[in-house]
Amino acid sequence: MKNVLITGAAGFIGSNFVRYELEKHADWNIVVYDKLTYAGNLDNLKDVAEKFGGRYRFMQGDIADREAVFGCVKDNGIDLIINFAADSHVDRSLTEPGSFIMTDVYGTYVLLEAAREFNIARFHQISTDEVYGDIEAPGRSTEEDKLHGSSPYSASKAGGDLMCLAYARSFNVPVTITRGTNNIGPFQYPEKVVPVWVTNAIDGLPLPMYGDGRQMRDYQYVLDHCEGIDVVIEKGALGEVYNIGSGIETRNIDLAHAILDLLGKPYSLIQTITDRPGHDRRYAIDNSKARELGWQPGHTFAQALEKTVRWYLENESWWRKIKSGEYLAYYKKQYAGREI
């Protein structure tokens, strides 16, 4: 059996990844280590605990807590560390940059120290295409491009990536990194654009859109991303970075239209608001390096979005529980008074 530590896996992508891996790898025992911040939710893993209880364990903790991390790795005989733990919302990074640095840079350092101390067989870092910054068409960011994080979030993730590569070179820690594009799918906390717009549209509420809505993003289905990560962990070369994304670019305005069309709602629900400071106009990656390992995306944009919208329609109790209390206060603070 392989003992795997997956940090931050009570969140969106991590919880989907845990489910994917337990179904695929009968020889994996998984320890989920999560701080359970506002976006961490054990409801995301409820079915996992019920179905895979013998091979799944949850521990609450902060990756920046060296003593707790080292104890977790040692006590569970960890062979593989996969780091999903991150503060990940750009808007929050503009008001709380310190927490992003603590988790995304210092927390990554602590995990790397644990990997070094206990001779972990593989350390895999989950990163983002946002570390490249925006890129003019028709260019696409490759793994060799310089990092130009333009928000505290992307800068902190870039710092974590560089720390991983430094540990690979300086201390021979067996590191791989994947940089994923925007994910959509089940269990995404409704502060990100797709679940915000889908759940608002279901209730007939405005869809807040930054600026002219012509920002370009690559949206991929979360399980395609999970498969890509798995392939890189199994086949990727140590010390290397791999971009994971659909390769399909979509403007935010077109995303809003597609969501409203799927729900049969009017375009008049789109509400233009003042743009985000330093908002990147276009992200686009070259995913050919991951494809060379045998991975390829399994969903078109239309398929991914339809599955996502259907999931939120069928799981209202999940997101309605979240869209109350602290969330309402955050939403009002983020969007109130910004209408154009």
Task: Describe each region flagged by the PLM.
Residues 39, 66, 187, 191, ...:
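Loop/helix-junction capping segments adjacent to catalytic residues or to phosphate/diphosphate-binding pockets
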Residues 149-156, 186, 190-194, 218-222:
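The catalytic Tyr-centered alpha-helix of NAD(P)H-dependent dehydrogenases
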Residues 134-136, 186-188, 192, 289:
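Short beta-loop-alpha junction of Rossmann-like oxidoreductase domains
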Residues 159, 163, 167, 197, ...:
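Hydrophobic alpha-helix immediately C-terminal to the catalytic Tyr-X-X-X-Lys motif of short-chain
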Residues 41, 186, 246:
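Short, conserved catalytic or interaction motifs in soluble domains
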Residues 1-183, 307, 315, 321-340:
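N-terminal Rossmann-like NAD(P)+-binding domain of SDR-like oxidoreductases, especially those catalyzing
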Residues 61, 195, 201-340:
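C-terminal substrate-binding subdomain of Rossmann-fold SDR/epimerase-dehydratase oxidoreductases
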